[in-house]
A protein has these predicted regions:
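Intracellular loop-helix junctions on the cytosolic face of multi-pass helical membrane proteins
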Residues: 1-10, 107-116, 127-128, 132-133, ...
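Intracellular juxtamembrane helix-capping segments at the cytosolic ends
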Residues: 127-140, 406-420
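Helix-to-loop junctions at the C-terminal end of transmembrane segments
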Residues: 61-77, 334-348, 450
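C-terminal ends and interior cores of transmembrane alpha-helices
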Residues: 85-108, 357-386
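Loop-to-transmembrane helix entry/capping segments in MFS-fold secondary transporters
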Residues: 45-46, 142-151, 318, 419-431
Length: 492
């Protein structure tokens, strides 16, 4: 007989997800600065998306493994917390080494070292992310699930705001240099990664210490599992062929809701990947009016010197991308506060689809905001001089933020109710395929589209992202949320 899972207080739910703030802090630093770092280390626009492929590939490999392993693990730290802590420690190592890639030039080319550290960071973030998702599903009862994932989304966006804006603050408030010659990384970016590593480790330790996972017998009672379906079942290790067969059987038999959400996820994450990779060159070209030739390493190498105005414009644009990313995270954090109530009132599908549509239209509107007029902007903590078009780009960040909040919460809230309790971890891991696969497709195609179709004019690839997200919005209406019978059949 299934026992009623106890309700959690607000602060208990907060503690379960608090580590997400630090993980997203690091993730935001990566999203806003990796293209900038790799460009400074010598990557061209076409190859940028290829370097970024390590992120979804790591997710594709790591999350299903970690999901399955955490379902079968129980030690003195619990089921999910050992993986969260280990991932955080590895991520900290990557965050310290990435901005120092030029130091290792005697052993590896800076771009190669940078790519390896991006791979380490992404693998580590994925080791943290998947168990955090499953931890919320484990600890938060169904009646509080919308609240649980909304708090998670709020914390993610708080971390993203601080992480995104940090290099800008270090430059314009503290006074660190934000420019770099080819083959170097700006000091403001280096120190931002050091601070991010510290925050990540601290918040994860808070969750590990302040959250007590249910004992196996309690978990089984709350999830309605029988002795034949233990949550911590430790079967003998099967041969590789058998494990692959079992994996593909799980994929084939995954709940219908999960398959339908995969379509929405494809078009959503295809768009997000483009934004993370190409916002920096798009803003630099479109708003700061830097010619696309200054993103060609061969041209730069052949030039007698890079004009100081180009170096300064690239640094300023890179910092402003952090402001834009922080802005959409602020709007996402605000929207996430109301997300659960809106979903309860209007339905998850309506809120999800509307949010994606706003995001898609916002991407497309990037074309409308070019204005080279230089103005002084008071940001309370400092005053900067930027093109008016840069300030106007804060408008579409509202829609991007709303879409981001929905993407972080809605599919998981819809999915959690469709998964059998004894397979939550592995299915959450498999669901990451719907995050990783579209990013891989985007990484393989976006660079070619940008160079072959748009002649390296990066603003148009942002429009492609908008069209993709609009298709995702339409796809939401074809998702059927799971019913009780389907869940029981999947649980076996």
């Amino acid at each position: 007989m299934q026992a009623t899972q106890p309700r959690l207080s607000f602060w208990q739910i907060w503690n379960v997800s608090f580590g997400f703030l630090g993980v997203q802090f690091g993730f935001a630093l990566q999203n806003a600065n990796v293209s900038r770092i790799l460009s400074d280390l010598g990557a061209d626009l076409h190859s940028l998306s290829l370097f970024w492929l390590v992120a979804p590939i790591m997710g594709l490999i790591v999350q299903p493994i970690v999901g399955s392993a955490s379902d079968r693990t129980w030690n003195r730290l619990g089921r999910r917390r050992p993986f969260i802590l280990a991932g955080a420690i590895a991520a900290v190592l990557g965050m310290i080494l990435l901005p120092n890639a030029p130091i290792f030039v005697a052993f590896l080319a800076p771009m190669v070292m940078g790519a390896l550290m991006v791979a380490l960071m992404d693998a580590s973030f994925n080791v943290c992310f998947q168990p955090f998702r499953s931890l919320v599903s484990d600890m938060v009862p169904p009646s509080q699930r919308n609240v649980g994932y909304s708090i998670q989304s709020l914390l993610i966006n708080i971390g993203a705001v601080i992480g995104s804006i940090l290099p800008f603050v270090l430059t314009n408030v503290i006074g660190l240099e934000n420019t770099a010659q080819m083959g170097e990384v700006a000091p403001s970016v280096v120190w931002a990664f050091y601070i991010g590593a510290t925050v990540l480790l601290g918040t994860v330790i808070w969750t590990v210490v302040r959250t007590k996972e249910y004992a196996p017998d309690e978990y089984n009672r709350y999830k309605g599992l029988t002795e034949e379906q233990p949550a911590t079942e430790k079967a003998p290790k099967a041969p590789l062929g058998q494990r692959l067969s079992e994996f593909f059987t799980l994929v084939k038999d995954m709940p219908k809701t999960m398959k339908q959400l995969a379509v929405v996820q494809f078009f959503s994450w295809f768009a997000l990947f483009i934004m993370w990779v190409y916002t920096t060159p798009a803003i630099t070209q479109h708003i700061w009016n830097v010619d696309k030739q200054w993103f060609d390493p061969a041209y730069i190498a052949a030039a007698p010197m890079v004009p100081e105005t180009i170096i300064m414009a690239k640094g300023a644009a890179g910092d402003w991308v952090g402001i834009l990313f922080a802005a959409y995270s602020v709007f996402a954090a605000i929207f996430s506060i109301f997300l659960a109530k809106l979903a309860d009132k209007f339905g998850r599908k309506t809120v999800y689809a509307s949010s994606l549509a706003l995001g898609g239209l916002s991407y497309v509107s990037f074309l409308l905001f070019q204005d080279l007029t230089m103005i002084n902007v008071n940001l309370l903590i400092t005053e900067v001089t930027v093109p008016l078009g840069a300030v106007k780009l804060l408008i579409p960040m509202v829609g991007v933020g709303i879409a981001w909040a929905a993407i972080l919460a809605m599919p998981y809230a819809m999915l959690a109710g469709a998964l059998p309790a004894n397979k939550t971890g592995v299915y959450m891991g498999i669901f990451n395929f719907t995050v990783a696969a579209p990013q891989i497709v985007s990484g393989l195609t976006a660079g070619w589209i940008l160079s072959s179709v748009f002649d390296n004019d990066a603003k148009y690839i942002i429009v492609v992202a908008g069209v993709s997200m609009l298709i995702g919005a339409v796809s939401v209406f074809f998702v059927n949320e799971a019913d009780k019978q389907e869940i029981e059949e999947a649980q076996g």
